Each structure stands twice: as structure tokens, then as C-alpha cells.
A protein has these predicted regions:
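Active-site anion-handling motifs in enzyme catalytic cores
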Residues: 1-232
Length: 232
């Protein structure tokens, strides 16, 4: 039994929150028992700034993209089963067959996530990156546009079903991954200069999909000032 590691910050985040319950559902047993082994699952977790101290590390679909690698990465403590995509594999000098897919796609294996026929799906749903929430007001923008706002801080089990029932999802990365797995059309968007295209490309290249994001204007003056300041 192993301890599943994910970023559990002050604000909930859809992609990170999937780790909380998805692995035990897919694997059929709990990973939430700390025996000194840490599993790096969904997310950009192969990072010196994130990885906790452990006796052993198992990489199960995680990716790179933020920080330097852990100091002992690749040593005897590390077992790499799979990574998010070909860019992570190339960066880590791994064989191409280690580049599988982002683990969020595994929601497709759950019986309650069987794709719905188009006749049973309705409306457009929008999910911003959770870091866009404090300075933005995307819920109000969605209300004005007649679009369903998906709060990335809501428990992921709830949001997943709302994605499943949408006709189109406009979203940050993990909502798009889930939408793709559930056969719901999706459009990638950029809301901030901090948007990480490496992560998007890592995933889309694992499926031979194009990545053509749409950049949206800020939803508030505060968000506009924030985005401007991040460019310098």
C-alpha cells in the first residue's frame, strides 16, 4: 500500500482533486496508506519544489513543467511506470513507451462516466484555471454569456458529471482532459501569461491532437492588471 501524493493547497483544484479518489476506484484498492512509498499521479508533480521525502517514489502518469527535478531523481528510489506525455519522457530521457497519457483520462473506466449520446448533452460549460479565480469574475461573465460556470474548487466528482452532460467544454487543461475522455468536444483557453503550454502540449501530443488555444481577455480590471504585471 502506498501514499498518493498531490497538491492539496488552500484552494481546491479540479485536476489535483481527482487524485483524492480516482486511483482507488481504478485500481480497486486504496493508495492512501503511508508506508514510506509515494505515488506521483495526476499533475505536474515531478518537481523539486513539490516532492516530499520518501523511501521510494512511483511515477504513475505525472509530468514535469515547473521546477528542477528532485535531487535524487532516477536513482534507486525511483520507479517510473508511466509519464504524462512525450515531452516529459524526452525531458527525463525515458523510452517513448513510458509516455502514456495524463491519468485524468482514466475517468473513462468508471461506469458512471460512460459517454452520453449527444441528444442527452446540452449547453456550453466553462472552467477557468483555479489561479484565475481571486482576481477574476468568470462566473459573472459566464452568466452574461449564457454559459455554465464550472468552479474548479468544487469537488471533482460533481464537476465531472457536469462536464459529461455538456455539449461543449471551454476550459483549463484537466477539464479538457476529462472532456476528451468522455467524448465531449472541448476548446483550450489561455487566461494568463502563466499558462503552461508545455503541459498542454505534453498531453495533446500523447494523443496526436493539435493544440490551438484561444486567449481570452481579462474578466475584471484587477485581473487585467495582474496579467499585465506577470509579463514583466
Amino acid at each position: 500500500m502506498k501514499h498518493i501524493f498531490y497538491i492539496d493547497g488552500e484552494r481546491n483544484n479540479f485536476g489535483d482533486d481527482l487524485n483524492r479518489w480516482l486511483w482507488s476506484r481504478v485500481l480497486g484498492f486504496s493508495l492512501d496508506v503511508d508506508d514510506g512509498t509515494v505515488v506521483l499521479g495526476i499533475g505536474t508533480l515531478i518537481s523539486r519544489g513539490f516532492v516530499p521525502s520518501a523511501n521510494k517514489y512511483v511515477v504513475l502518469s505525472a509530468g514535469v513543467g515547473y521546477d528542477a527535478l528532485p535531487l535524487d531523481f532516477g536513482g534507486q528510489k525511483w520507479e517510473i511506470l508511466s509519464v504524462r506525455g512525450p515531452l516529459t519522457a524526452q525531458f527525463l530521457n525515458l523510452p517513448p513507451e513510458k509516455a502514456i497519457i495524463d491519468g485524468a483520462a482514466l475517468v473513462r473506466l468508471l461506469p458512471e462516466c460512460e459517454p452520453l449520446p449527444e441528444s442527452q448533452r446540452d449547453g456550453v460549460a466553462f472552467m477557468p484555471h483555479y489561479e484565475s479565480l481571486p482576481a477574476g469574475n468568470w462566473e459573472q461573465v459566464c452568466g452574461m454569456a449564457g454559459v455554465e460556470f464550472l468552479d474548479p474548487q468544487v469537488p471533482s466528482e460533481i464537476t465531472l458529471q457536469r462536464i459529461r452532460k455538456a455539449r461543449l467544454v471551454v476550459a483549463a487543461m484537466h477539464a479538457a482532459i476529462v472532456a476528451d475522455a468522455l467524448r465531449v468536444p472541448w476548446i483550450p483557453v489561455v487566461l494568463s501569461p502563466l499558462s503552461n503550454s508545455f503541459k498542454w502540449l505534453d498531453w495533446t501530443m500523447s494523443l496526436n491532437l493539435p493544440y490551438n488555444p484561444i486567449t481570452l481577455q481579462a474578466s475584471t480590471l484587477l485581473e487585467s492588471v495582474r496579467n499585465f504585471s506577470l509579463r514583466f
